[in-house]
Design a protein with these regions (language model features):
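Class I (Rossmann-like) S-adenosyl-L-methionine-dependent methyltransferase catalytic domain
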Residues: 3, 9-13, 20-94, 103-151, ...
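Conserved beta-strand/loop positions that form the S-adenosyl-L-methionine
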Residues: 99
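Short acidic/histidine-rich motifs immediately flanking catalytic phosphotransfer sites
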Residues: 155
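A conserved beta-strand element that flanks and buttresses the S-adenosyl-L-methionine
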Residues: 160
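Short catalytic micro-motifs in class I SAM-dependent methyltransferases
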Residues: 163-167
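Conserved helix-to-beta-strand junction in the class I
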Residues: 179-184
Length: 315
């Protein structure tokens, strides 16, 4: 799919494979210049089709560093602790829309708790992995396609969007949230997106992605007629990102760089897990305390809904 043209929101301050856009409001009018996201969706699709050979790890971005299944499980457990309370008002008779369902980890969890679950993903290889995981669960429908255009019947009581908007140009992200506002008219919409602390960073070389700040997602939601009710940092992602950064650092050593990633990632994660209070807790905070944003990427959960839902929840 060819990316659409987009609303002029950001100023280009660097060029090359990674482009950084600060908040426009922080610049004077003479400094402002209009730019576009320029994400190529065909490249996004190619990346995920290739990554799906290790679908479970890939859906949690653990595949390139050879991180083990125990790392994926650690992250998923910490994520569930954030997300599940946001769906507490739903019942066993509720329906959930899972956009960007990947290998089906969240799809299975929702299907175990609710009457109807529809999962959507653009990667046939990811959906094949999801079908294997889900087996003969009869209350799940999986749809291959673009979440903007895929045929979706009925409305839902809640939606989960797992790392999808970061692969969409801004205008399309607004359009998707507008569609969700109609598909989930009264319930919670939960986003999980990799983020940066300020502004937007766009990578558009061999890997196309737009890392936005939570503040920018608030603006995108507002443009779609939705309210950001709550924002929570994804601690499970943060733990895994520490491992990712350390594996990347270790693999700069020639003898380690030539090895299978699993021979580096697996033992490193075990060491981090055994020393978690220091390596996953104190170390990142100590580095941030001296003014270094590390790990570079963050990840956030954002609870979205209508103004009426926000009022019902006391926000």
């Amino acid at each position: 799919m060819t990316p659409l043209c987009h609303a002029p929101v950001w100023e280009l301050v660097a060029s090359g494979p990674q482009t950084v856009f600060p908040l426009l409001s922080q610049k004077t009018p003479t400094e402002r210049r209009l730019v576009l996201d320029h994400l190529d969706y065909s490249i996004v699709r190619q990346y995920w089709d290739a990554a799906a050979t290790s679908a479970t790890a890939a859906s949690y971005m653990a595949h390139e560093q050879g991180l083990p299944q125990s790392c994926v499980e650690h992250r998923f457990a910490r994520e569930r602790a954030v997300v599940q309370p946001w769906f507490d008002d739903l019942t066993s008779e509720s329906s959930i829309l899972d956009i960007g369902c990947g290998a089906g980890a969240w799809t299975m969890l929702f299907a175990q708790q609710h009457r109807r679950v529809v999962g959507i993903d653009m990667s046939p290889n990811m959906l094949a992995a999801a079908r294997t995981r889900l087996g003969d669960m009869g209350n799940v429908e999986l749809i291959e396609g673009d979440a903007l255009q895929a045929p979706i019947e009925g409305t839902f009581d809640g939606a989960f969007v797992g790392g999808v908007l970061m692969y969409m140009n801004r205008d399309d992200a607004v359009l998707l949230l507008e569609r969700l506002r109609l598909l989930v008219p009264t319930g919670p919409i939960v986003l999980r997106e990799s983020t940066v602390r300020r502004g937007v960073e766009v990578k558009n070389a061999e890997y196309h992605v737009a890392y936005r700040s939570p503040t920018e997602y608030e603006a995108i939601a507002a443009d779609a007629g939705l309210t950001v009710i709550a924002v929570e940092r994804n601690r499970g992602y943060a733990d895994m990102e520490v491992a990712v950064e350390l594996v990347n650092l270790a693999r700069r050593i020639p003898v380690l760089g030539r090895r299978d990633p699993e021979l580096v990632g697996s033992p490193l994660w075990r060491a981090l897990d055994m020393t978690a209070p220091v390596t996953l807790g104190l170390l990142p905070r100590a580095i941030e305390a001296v003014g270094v944003a590390w790990p570079h990427l963050t990840n956030h959960f954002m609870l979205l809904g209508t103004v009426e839902l926000a009022q019902d929840l006391g926000h």
